Amino acid sequence: MAHQLKLLKDDFFASDQQAVAVADRYPQDVFAEHTHDFCELVIVWRGNGLHVLNDRPYRITRGDLFYIHADDKHSYASVNDLVLQNIIYCPERLKLNLDWQGAIPGFSASAGQPHWRLGSVGMAQARQVIGQLEHESSQHVSFANEMAELLFGQLVMLLNRHRYTSDSLPPTSSETLLDKLITRLAASLKSPFALDKFCDEASCSERVLRQQFRQQTGMTINQYLRQVRVCHAQYLLQHSRLLISDISTECGFEDSNYFSVVFTRETGMTPSQWRHLNSQKD
């Protein structure tokens, strides 16, 4: 078995007193599977890519938020103008008396829900705090580490306030149409999605929404939905014993032959080949 890449604190933190830092990825390149001896928050600003976290694939784009524990293994592939930021931190170095464990999923162990989403409002507020945090964490002046930790605490609480599960916006949300569209797409894994119906409900222009979606994500709406479904199929093929025909239905494909064609085109192998290859990992 090949030696797994592990990213180390000494390469990312200025000193053993520093608890928090920001690692920009403008853009994020393909990155082989790795672990860390620190933890991180990942926020995606635009573009798209394939993020595989603990053998589960996610097609990521603007607004995706991940809580990564040191022991988690993850990688990036099939990236397309993917812009994100990693807010990296060492739990054992944090000194503020906050309920870190309650606020950060998987803070003390690789558990809890790692994947969430942020709408445009949450993204704008997070970006502002991260900018301040990045500035403080790069300073070599008195109390820079303390200021950075205060800002990190603010960011963590802000994310708690604004995050939501990928397929369920809060009913009182005032998020943009693009946020609502991405959420509706995530909730359409098993059922058909009709863009014209969505636009009628939202009283918006289908053409303008298509353009806005492509500008922000680097994909068409159909490409995104298809790839989200294929990612879910990959997960089910590896981690369930469902028949391929049943997985096809679970992932919104009415015809299993068409599912096989789409899956093969997206992954380079048939569903059966994928299942056989990845079952050897478990």
UniProtKB/Swiss-Prot annotation:
Transmembrane segments: none
Protein name: HTH-type transcriptional activator RhaR
Tagged with keyword Chloroplast: no
BP GO annotations: positive regulation of DNA-templated transcription; rhamnose metabolic process
Domain HTH araC/xylS-type residue range list: 179-277
Site (Interaction with sigma-70): D246
Function: Activates expression of the rhaSR operon in response to L-rhamnose.
GO CC terms: cytoplasm
Subunit structure, as described in the record: Binds DNA as a dimer.
InterPro entries: AraC-bd, Homeodomain-like_sf, HTH_AraC, HTH_AraC-typ_CS, RhaR_RhaS-like_N, RmlC-like_jellyroll, RmlC_Cupin_sf, Tscrpt_act_RhaR
Native source organism of the sequence: Escherichia coli O139:H28 (strain E24377A / ETEC)
Intracellular or extracellular location(s): Cytoplasm
